[in-house]
Design a protein with these regions (language model features):
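Conserved small/polar residues in nucleotide/adenosyl-binding loops
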Residues: 261-270
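Acidic, proline/glycine-rich low-complexity IDRs
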Residues: 132-211
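Short, surface-exposed beta-strand/loop "edge" segments at domain boundaries and coil↔beta transitions
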Residues: 12-16, 57-60, 181-183, 207-214, ...
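N-terminal ordered "arm"
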Residues: 1-44, 197-233
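Mature extracellular/secreted ectodomains of secretory-pathway proteins
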Residues: 84-137, 269
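Acidic, aromatic-enriched beta-alpha/helix-loop junctions
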Residues: 30-60, 64-66, 226-252
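Acidic, low-complexity intrinsically disordered segments
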Residues: 62-69, 73-86
Length: 270
């Protein structure tokens, strides 16, 4: 899944527009950030880019148009959406966003971790399948063959529909099943998420007990620097750095786990 975001500086419309591909490819990351900075936008923390237009497979994101956005939040959201493996998850995310009227970036990011809890009916012609999908949703997407064989999907669907709690949206009829929006994203520290398998995974903290920021290496230079800024780290010498995982042999992992006092973060030189 690829999207394109057309961004501008709301304080300087004369600077024109810049189109960013989402998720941002590693080999384009530094160049894109430099281009945004040249237009006096693209701060690591501030929502200083105006979303003029977004093009892609998620019409619900049109509600971000005309609003200020943060480029790293936008990139993370695009990566999360790219992880959705089927049309059902797309409908769950977009339907829940309409049902709960979410349009804030933090809410949309958190919704990617929660939308799997809602049931969305997009086709009422096969109630047996509707009931089976609803049962799977209620059980975290898992069910044994025996459970499914013994399930009366038609009756399960009728019971759901008869409750009358469905919200009609352009993406289907949404039944929230008591969904509680996850709060894993606090507006600053992105939750752990492996978009691409990294060679090395680290966490950094401003101090012991502070929220963790995840680093997936190798990564573009500016992405690492911006991640440290989001973590609140002014001087890298003062940060708490922890080894989490790697694709290196076990012997190398043992060495990496011993000490990070003099570690230089590797970067992607593409």
């Amino acid at each position: 899944m690829r999207m394109n975001a057309v961004l501008s500086n709301p304080k300087h419309p004369e600077y024109g527009q810049f189109t960013v591909p989402l998720p941002i490819p590693h080999n384009q990351y530094d160049g894109i950030m430099e281009a945004l900075n040249a237009m006096d936008m693209g701060d690591p923390l501030a929502r200083d880019c105006q979303m003029d237009e977004i093009l892609g497979e998620y019409p619900i994101l049109k509600r971000l148009e005309g609003k200020p956005v943060n480029i790293d939040e936008l990139d993370y959201l695009a990566k999360r959406l790219d992880s959705f493996c089927c049309a059902l998850e797309d409908a769950q995310f977009q339907g829940a966003a309409v049902s709960y009227d979410y349009s804030d970036m933090a809410d949309l990011i958190n919704l990617t971790f929660s939308c799997q809890e809602v049931t969305v009916i997009t086709d009422f012609s096969d109630l047996e399948q509707v009931g089976r999908e609803h049962f799977m949703v209620l059980n975290g997407g898992c069910a044994s063959k025996e459970e499914l064989d013994n399930l009366d999907g038609y009756e399960t669907a009728l019971l759901l529909i008869d409750e009358g709690d469905g919200v009609v949206t352009p993406y289907g009829v949404v039944y929230d099943n008591g969904m509680c929006l996850s709060q894993v994203y606090d507006g600053r520290h992105f939750p752990q998420y492996f978009y691409e398998p990294p060679l090395l995974t680290l966490t950094v903290q401003e101090s012991k007990g502070a929220p963790q920021t995840w680093l997936y290496l190798p990564a573009p230079d500016l992405q690492i620097k911006r991640s440290l800024i989001r973590a609140g780290i002014v001087d890298p010498a003062d940060m708490e750095l922890s080894f989490q995982a790697s694709e290196f042999p076990d012997a190398v992992d043992c060495v990496l786990a011993v000490s990070y006092t003099h570690l230089t973060l590797p970067t992607n030189r593409e």
